[in-house]
Amino acid sequence: MNSWWGRLMMKRLCRLVWLLPLTAVLLFTLVSLAPIDPVQAYVGARMSMIGPEQQAAIEAAWGLDQPGWIRFFHWLAHLVQGDLGDSISYNAPVLTVLVERFPASLALMGCSFLAAFVVGSGLGVLAAACQGRWPDRLIRGWAMVISVSPGFWIALLFISIFAVQLAWLPSCCALPPGVTQDEAHWWQYGRHLVLPVLTLSIYGTGPLILHVRQRLIGFLDGPSARHLRLHGMSSTRLALGPGSRHALGSAVTVHLASIGELFGGSVLAETIFAWPGLGQATVKAATGADAPLLLGIALVTVVVVLLGNLLADILAAWVDPRLRIMPQEETLPRLKRLPWLKASARLKTASRLKVEPKS
Amino acid sequence: MKTQQMMSLQVEALTLTMKGHSQPLVGPLSWRLEAGQCMGLVGGSGAGKSLVADALFQALPAEIECQGRMTLNDAPLSPLSMALMPQSIEALDPLAPVTQQIRRFARRNAEAVDPTRLLAQVQLEAEAGALFPHQLSGGMARRVLLALTLATGADWLVIDEPTLGLDPTVADQLIQLLSTLKAQGKGVLLISHDLVRLIQVADEVMILASGQQVETAPVAAFDGSGGGLKHPFSRALWQAQQWTQNPLTIHQGDER
Amino acid sequence: MKRVMVSIVSIVTRSDDTGKSYRLALFMAIVVTLMIWGGGALPDTMMAVNPAQRSLAPSWQHWLGTDLLGRDMASRTLAGLAQSLKVGLLAAALSTLLAMVMGMMAALNRSLDRLVSSLTDMMLGMPHFVLLIMVAYAFGGGTVGVTWAVALTHWPRLARLLRHEAKTLVKSDYVQVSRSLGRSNLWLARHHLMPHLMPQWIAGFVVIFPHAILHEAGLSFIGLGIEPHLPSIGVMLANSLNAMLAGFWWVVLAPGLGLMLVAFGFERLGERLRRQALPPDRGSSGVSPGQVA
């Protein structure tokens, strides 16, 4: 644990020790607060067919008659054993649902993540290189507009243009109707992936473009770039060489830290495109009062986002050595409020109060 | 004698003017710097010393116009035949280790550059090559900046305020380093307001008063009360520096 | 009254950057007021179901066309925007208020400070939209649910910023003197902290607002937000899917464009205010500078 990333990992692990339990408590509390009767959600329309005794029996069987904190520890104990409970809406263990749906989400989010990074940082570099001229204005305006456009609206527009008017691409699902996973060709899969990835990645480029542009301009206008330019380095070389470390290094960090946003976008995108991933399951769980599934998904995404942030921190310190934690670096002891300051202040103010006549 | 004649950086009537103004900011300045010599450039704050360096490198702000003739061995002066050591250590790239920065500047050099040897030349350990700028002390950072100018292989160095913010011992060492470079045949234009250290290395000193070149004096003139200096401003500048020197050395012990 | 008018006019007509911000702010305030008032005052007949005029393309009579039930899209968009703006305003106000309280509490009390920073860290560590869904779910969805969801999830960044500002204020001499004179924390917060934090607070509100309405629309879109029978942008877009697949593109274009334009205006205003009132925030997790919401 002598290297800087070892110290970083230790620091982050210590954080996780209190962060994860606190998060689990918060999530569980939120789900338990919901004014939805789980029994009713489970039984659904047949509620009228069961009497109050049967209802109480089901509640007892699920442990719903117990106080909240007992239910929490019950849930936690099962969680530690890898049991996340049963999903009501999919009629299967939550873990199975998660494992089944994770690959589709991973494909969608992974492709979007990469596409957004390539396009976003490319446009950002271009904008910085043309600072103040029309390509820069165009790209900046574009970034601004998409960062305030509702992502799901962009998806609907794409469907309207590419799927309905032009009829180039499919608008629904991961595969053509009637084709099973085994029969499918990879290109069928790919064709269905295009529109969701386009939607999701466009949404992610907005902040990235602005960030890369800002960082690169900051470097190119800064003293060290000026110094290199004075000694004969060309602007292109400057932007692609030393500048890339300034711009892209932090771009990776920002992009990784925005994985949570990406997942949020995928919830909407998967709903619109009927993509069989975790996002679609989230909506189904939330609207179908499927508390165990909702909790499970929330936990998975929290872990993914934490990992993303950890990776972002490591990369940030790798790119910028000023962020590395050095062993000799000790936090200065916080200055205690000085008692004499208190006393003298009181004295001063008291004397002033005496002199000033009261009106 | 003829080679001496050939190797010189000559500036005639260098005048810097703010666009739309008739009064020049700096100049007209004229000087001639020979290889293996050091020309000092002094003046009060805001006299336009750093602008002169920018003018040599054709890197003036857009609103300043530059007139005059700058030649190197009678050919027009190219910025690429000189190297600048800037005033601020911000000029170091914060995200690159020293060795990598040396390589960036060495790209211009026709000869292969060994970073370790270069670091040794500015009296830095080879280990310093792996350090990032934020890990360097002020004196080390200045030496790295000097190493960067050497990496370019340029024969003409423009050194801007090398001792600013350094403590006296470190500043003296840096000046010592500059005289070694001078002895190796580099032509040095040394911009500083630290006249006392300047005359330890310079052969001639050019004095600016609010942008005007009032005098170019040989170092020998800076002696005693400055009787050898022609212009009253030069004398005042010299006396002021001497006056501050003495009380400072007396009081230094009492301060802490 | 006259003096107020005169000072407003003199501020708005300033030719510098600040004047530009004030003009934009005044313009956005007028737009929002008109929309909320206009959306509420629309006669019911404008939005009534009219089977004779189903799915008409935009024309002089129906500027933005009609939907599958023959309702005028322009009126519905306006009414939907009014609804979204109302929820957004309330949620953003609650959120910034929460941020203010949290920030001041953290600055004035050390143990509360620890609590607030852990809570902030935790909230920022969670995927934003999932948290929104969870809170909306906890409140059982609907207009109430979505308002609370947005209000309870958008405060952390602003709270972190206000906490930082308040902490430097608390360290200053005059606050320390007041404290040693026996003033209560409440008094300090009201007289020393709040007036100084006002600019950041207002800037924070404007920055949060567009996010609030966008997230409200997102939640309504997936069915966890505003009730389906009320006009709202999210619900309208969710219902437009079938009409759009049938080729009636105008049912999609109008509501989204309206929402985007309002959000765009506030984003621009927020950008200006942020530059003027908020210092660049350099978080440890590489959050882009100045990002508040």
Feature roles, as predicted:
Chain A
Residues 2-7, 20, 98-135, 151, ...:
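Alpha-helical transmembrane segments of integral membrane proteins
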Residues 141-206:
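Membrane-water interface segments at transmembrane-helix boundaries in multipass membrane proteins
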Residues 59-68, 85-90, 94, 176-193, ...:
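Membrane-interfacial helix-loop-helix junctions in multi-pass membrane proteins
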Residues 20-70, 166-186:
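Hydrophobic alpha-helical transmembrane segments of membrane transport/permease proteins
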Residues 10-16:
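N-terminal signal-anchor/signal peptide hydrophobic helix marking the start
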Residues 49-81, 273-285:
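Short hydrophobic, aromatic-rich alpha-helical segments embedded in or entering the lipid bilayer
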Residues 67-111:
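Individual transmembrane alpha-helix segments
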